[in-house]
Amino acid sequence: MEAYIVKIAPAAEGEEFALTIEITDEKGLRRENHCIAAQYFRETTLPSHIDAPYAADAEMLSQIRYLSLCTAAIRAGLRLLEFSFNTKKNLRGKLIRKGFPPEAADEAVAFFSENGYIDEAGQAEMLAWELAEKKKYGKNRIKTELFGKGFESEVIRDALE
């Protein structure tokens, strides 16, 4: 198998890099198109642009495919977060149900957590207050509700203080 990256270009207003790879093997020539989040792309050894085909070994090809999958999981996660709040646990489960491997779902959840898209502590506090004030739930009922929504025990404990 021979693989060459034939195109690397910024995409999505610089938030991603688009790559086109030509692969020749016993099946013939085929092209793969991938998008990688800029944050992940900077962690690779790939140049930001090429003037001639750039040889890609099996390890590099595997890395590109994985990072492209993680980028797709981030895009899917953003769409999910646009419509409703999700805990890390719930978002991970939804991404896996959409067909992403657990590793890519974990990577996307870490991205959202590190970049402030998921604030479980703030959401748990707000929900605990709402349940106590509006629905007049007691601590145990609030704890059960928060746990049912996927909040971790430590986050629940802090929200109830």
Give residue spans per PLM region.
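An alpha-helical, amphipathic repeat domain used for nucleic-acid recognition
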Residues: M1-E161
